[in-house]
């Protein structure tokens, strides 16, 4: 009888991928990135172990918001104080902090536990014109448009 394969944290090979977000819909980009961060694209995927890879997203300010999401979709956060609810439209968030828009979208597709937070730390987002600091890792290009 065969036993089920369980990945061990010290045996995991992690790769680096770079993704260009130019003219890619936000949700489709986020779902592919979340899949790679979790490690579900690998045959060694184990749900209780962080088997995912590192992902670098460039040109975050050029991501596409389809439909009326730029004016209708609202992101909320609360300061913890009475009356501290803050709201920001997706279009405004893309203009002022495009990194946060992609990070929030990907984080919403990861598990809501300690493992999901650890997987979210492997995401690095850069707007256009910013210097990518992970070039020493020699990231492989992951073409989202071919996967869609």
UniProtKB/Swiss-Prot annotation:
GO process terms (BP): negative regulation of translation; translation
Pfam families assigned to the protein according to its UniProt record, in alphabetical order: Ribosomal_L13
GO molecular function, one term: mRNA binding
Keywords from the named record: Ribonucleoprotein, Ribosomal protein
Gene3D superfamilies tied to this protein: Ribosomal protein L13
GO cellular component labels: cytosolic large ribosomal subunit
Function: This protein is one of the early assembly proteins of the 50S ribosomal subunit, although it is not seen to bind rRNA by itself. It is important during the early stages of 50S assembly.
HAMAP family (alphabetical): Ribosomal_uL13
Family of this protein: Belongs to the universal ribosomal protein uL13 family.
Subunit text: Part of the 50S ribosomal subunit.
UniProt name for this protein: Large ribosomal subunit protein uL13
Species: Oenococcus oeni (strain ATCC BAA-331 / PSU-1)
Lineage summary: Bacteria, Bacillati, Bacillota, Bacilli, Lactobacillales
């Amino acid at each position: 009888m065969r036993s089920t394969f369980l990945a061990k944290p010290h045996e995991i090979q992690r790769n680096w991928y770079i993704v260009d977000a130019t003219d890619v819909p936000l949700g489709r980009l986020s779902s592919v990135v979340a899949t790679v961060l979790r490690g579900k694209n690998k045959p060694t995927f184990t749900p209780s172990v962080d088997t995912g890879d590192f992902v670098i997203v460039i040109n975050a300010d050029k991501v596409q918001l389809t439909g009326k999401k730029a004016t209708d979709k609202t992101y909320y956060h609360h300061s913890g104080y009475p009356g501290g609810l803050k709201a920001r439209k997706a279009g405004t968030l893309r203009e002022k902090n495009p990194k946060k828009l992609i990070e929030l979208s990907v984080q919403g597709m990861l598990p809501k536990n300690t493992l999901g937070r650890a997987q979210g730390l492997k995401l690095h987002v850069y707007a256009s014109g910013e210097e990518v600091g992970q070039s020493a890792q020699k990231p492989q290009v992951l073409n989202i448009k071919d996967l869609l």
